[in-house]
Curated annotation (Swiss-Prot):
It is found in: Cell membrane. Its main location: membrane. One of its GO terms (molecular function) is quinone binding. GO terms for cellular component: cell surface; cytoplasm; early endosome; endoplasmic reticulum; extracellular space; Golgi apparatus; membrane; microvillus. It catalyses: methylamine + O2 + H2O = formaldehyde + H2O2 + NH4(+); benzylamine + O2 + H2O = benzaldehyde + H2O2 + NH4(+); 2-phenylethylamine + O2 + H2O = 2-phenylacetaldehyde + H2O2 + NH4(+). Residues 2-6 are cytoplasmic. Gene3D superfamilies: 3.10.450.40, Copper amine oxidase, catalytic domain. Belongs to the copper/topaquinone oxidase family. Ca(2+) 2 binds at E572, E641, F663, E667. It comes from Rattus norvegicus. This is Amine oxidase [copper-containing] 3.
């Protein structure tokens, strides 16, 4: 290579480097040399200010802190000086257990919503424990009007047909604390030798804790609870770490000093008392299995053992959110509804409208139960009715980016439970629009004509999560762009376990050296008050039949022809479908108004559930959740039948306060305001993969409400998200295909709020 050639190449290299530097500098702004900031996505639609929602949502809004405070002040003033803060109340005290919204009568709400009448009077429902009265009882009082209450009325007899016995009351936190004191300071020291030998027990230590079961006894009037004793492992779930000790505590007496241990169970054998257990241990008559103080083996912490990797996918709104939330109301271009949280029953939505037309008045969770089996007394007798504990009460803050999309809208919930002052649960709800990564509908044609048409499936979701002891329930209300509503729940959290001994594998799977994951079922019940094109609806059942016939064009041959069967369900008995029996695959509520094609406008109820067989009716506790007998039941809507369950059923399942079978009285359901009651559930046999805790995958059930001839055609046909192009069109042209414009419309960086968490104690 000549010197001249070398100089030319060197000059070209210098020019190239100079050009690259110029390009890089062109990408810098005049802010001291930093790269120019990318365009940030708008937080609201540029052409739309935050919407002011109609005050019509107010009838269903949960009580505000100011309203809760006003009610409590009124109760303290009018119930006398003997009222004790529930956080400190003993069974012999009078206290306010809870205050929440008293839902308005439907007729009054509709007069306001539909005919411009005055809004219903806002009232509160207060539950009072009168332990200090000569005949202790539970009373329910309606207090109003809010926000300045001037009256209260006792509705106990009106709502329940008589007084509520005191033993039916839910257990206060203070009562659990007194039981804790009794067990760990009065009773366990009687077996300190055995417990030190098996479980590293220290009298002043905190390495053991208790876990409640329910129901509490074997007959009405009992208040005797089996408590399991577990290792307390800091930063990890204690639920899979039983030591094999279970205690039956009788806590019926109003004086905690009179509470007693009725029975003791230890690693497969029953004893009359802890003293007897200790004496037999000292005599060498107890075969003790040593349980390490770091638990029963396995990986129990939810802290990952690997460092964080690359960030997972993130959804954002390139042109701002397409929905808004104000107070309790959500509104999008398609949907509008109010949402709330019952302190005991859980999530609920009201006045649900699609394209401005109401399709349902109320969709709400009613109850959730977990029924267990096992070979220890605690596991074999457990049936948690979560409404008694409080599905709303035990809702948790939603963790941004895990429980909900990072950029979801988060909403607080205010409540007054076991306290004289309101508290706030931060981030109790999240609302978000989600691209499902799935076409709602599509077709690609290569026959005769060449085109593609489709629309992406985006949904609007309202979510809350309740942690009831070991299990976390994720509750979703999902709104689709074709007018369908999806209601579902997923179970996650820790499994409940028992000490593994004997024939334990009849009742589950061994998941650690000394731990049996106990078999159980999850079931939830839902109220669905559909108003399909009006209040007067009819229930229809459709399915298929194979009908033999001669082939018309060749009669010597036969064929089986598929045809639709239709039946009008005229009574509540006809419309009650027991679990395990055949249920019509198409069941829908319809009006007497027709669509363009002459069919009754309807909404179909499609259930996705694996509930299996219900608890046999011979069980003495089965009457407490007779709704569990039915896959689906349709009844007349009645104000005096607001809920299929009761918080009092848990502690007196033998004489339940609410028996759902009373709702099915064979009245007509033709042309009436109807409610569909839906059961969804599944069987869970815990297995190794439930360690460290249960995943949501495959552990979700629920139902759809789907338009059935409600429209003249699929309403998503008018979705602005639709895509259509033909073979002869340029699919890269933004005028033809809006997805081709994403490089412009979605070329922005979302504003990510700082990570926050609602905390572990209520404010």
């Amino acid at each position: 290579m000549t010197q001249k050639t070398t100089l030319v190449l060197l000059a070209l290299a210098v020019i190239t480097i100079f050009a690259l530097v110029c390009v890089l500098l062109a990408g810098r702004s005049g802010d001291g040399g930093r790269l120019s900031q990318p365009l940030h996505c708008p937080s609201v639609l540029p052409s739309v200010q935050p919407q002011t929602h109609p005050g019509q949502s107010q009838p269903f809004a949960d009580l505000s802190p100011e309203e809760l405070t006003a009610v409590m002040s009124f109760l303290i003033k009018h119930l006398g000086p003997g009222l004790v803060d529930a956080a400190q109340a003993r069974p012999s005290d009078n206290c306010v257990f809870s205050v929440e919204l008293q839902l308005p009568a439907k007729a009054a709400a509709l007069a306001h919503l539909d005919r411009g009448g005055p809004p219903p009077v806002r009232e509160a429902l207060a539950i009072i424990f009168f332990g200090g009265q000569p005949k202790p009882n539970v009373s329910e009082l309606v207090v109003g009007p809010l926000p300045h209450p001037s009256y209260m009325r006792d509705v106990t007899v009106e709502r329940h047909g008589g007084p509520l016995p005191y033993y039916r009351r839910p257990v206060l936190t203070r009562e659990y604390q007194d039981i804790q004191e009794m067990i760990f300071h009065r009773e366990l020291p009687q077996a300190s030798g055995l417990l030190h030998h098996c479980c590293f027990y220290k009298r002043q230590g905190h390495n053991l804790l208790k876990m409640t079961t329910a129901p509490r006894g074997l007959q009405s009037g009992d208040r005797a609870t089996w408590f399991g004793i577990y290792y307390n492992l800091s930063g990890a779930g204690f639920y899979p770490h039983p030591i094999g000790l279970e205690l039956l505590v009788d806590h019926k007496a109003l004086d905690p000093a009179l509470w007693t241990i009725q029975k003791v169970f230890y690693q497969g054998r029953y004893y009359e008392s802890l003293t007897q257990l200790e004496d037999m241990f000292e005599a060498g008559l107890v075969n003790v299995v040593l349980v390490p103080d770091n638990g029963t083996g396995g990986s129990w912490s939810l802290k990952s053992s690997v460092p964080p990797g690359r960030a997972p996918p993130l959804q954002f709104h390139p042109e701002g959110p397409r929905f808004s939330v104000q107070g309790s109301q959500v509104r999008s271009s398609l949907w509008a509804f109010s949402f709330g949280l019952g302190a005991f029953s859980g999530p609920r939505i009201f006045d649900i409208r699609f394209q401005g037309e109401r399709v349902a008045y109320e969709i709400s969770v009613q109850e959730a139960i977990a029924l267990y089996g096992g070979n220890s007394p605690a596991s074999m007798s457990t049936c948690y009715m979560d409404g008694s504990f409080g599905i709303g009460k035990y809702s948790t803050p939603l963790t941004r980016g895990v429980d909900c999309p990072y950029l979801a809208t988060y909403v607080d919930w205010h409540f007054l439970l076991e306290s004289q002052t309101p508290k706030t649960l931060r981030d109790a709800f999240c609302v978000f629009e989600q691209n499902q990564g799935l076409p709602l509908r599509r077709h690609h044609s290569d026959f005769y004509s060449h085109y593609f048409g489709g629309v992406v499936e985006t949904v609007l979701v309202v979510r809350s999560v309740a942690t009831l002891l070991n299990y976390d329930y994720v509750w979703d209300m999902v709104f689709h762009s074709n007018g369908a509503i999806e209601v579902k729940f997923h179970a996650t959290g820790y499994i409940t376990s028992a000490f593994f001994f004997g024939a334990g594998e009849k009742f589950g799977n061994r998941v650690a050296e000394h731990t049996l994951g106990t078999v159980h079922t999850h079931n939830a019940h839902f109220k669905v008050d559909l108003d399909v094109a009006g209040l007067k609806n009819w229930a229809w059942a459709e399915d298929l039949a194979f009908v033999p016939m001669n082939v018309p064009w060749q009669p010597e041959f036969q064929m089986q022809r598929l045809q639709v069967t239709r039946k009008l369900l005229e009574t509540e008995e006809e419309a009650a479908f027991p679990l395990g029996n055949a249920t019509p695959r198409y069941l829908y509520l319809a009006s007497n108004h027709s669509n363009k094609w002459g069919h009754r406008r309807g909404y179909r109820i499609q259930i996705l559930s694996f509930a299996g067989k219900p608890l046999p009716q011979e069980s003495p506790i089965e009457k407490a959740f007779t709704w569990g007998r039915y896959h689906l039941a349709v009844t007349q809507r009645k104000e005096e039948e607001p809920s299929s369950s009761s918080i009092y059923n848990q502690n007196d399942p033998w004489t339940p306060t609410v028996d759902f079978t009373d709702f099915i009285s064979n009245e007509t359901i033709a042309g009436e305001d109807l409610v569909a009651w839906v059961t969804a559930g599944f069987l869970h046999i815990p297995h190794a993969e439930d360690i460290p805790n249960t995943v949501t995958v495959g552990n979700g059930v629920g139902f759809f409400l789907r338009p059935y001839n409600f429209f003249d055609e699929d309403p998503s046909f008018y979705s602005p998200d639709s895509i259509y192009f033909r073979k002869d069109q340029d699919v890269t042209d933004c005028e033809v295909n809006s997805l081709a414009c994403l490089s412009q419309t979605a070329n922005c960086v979302p504003d990510l709020p700082a990570f926050s968490h609602g905390g572990f104690t209520y404010k």
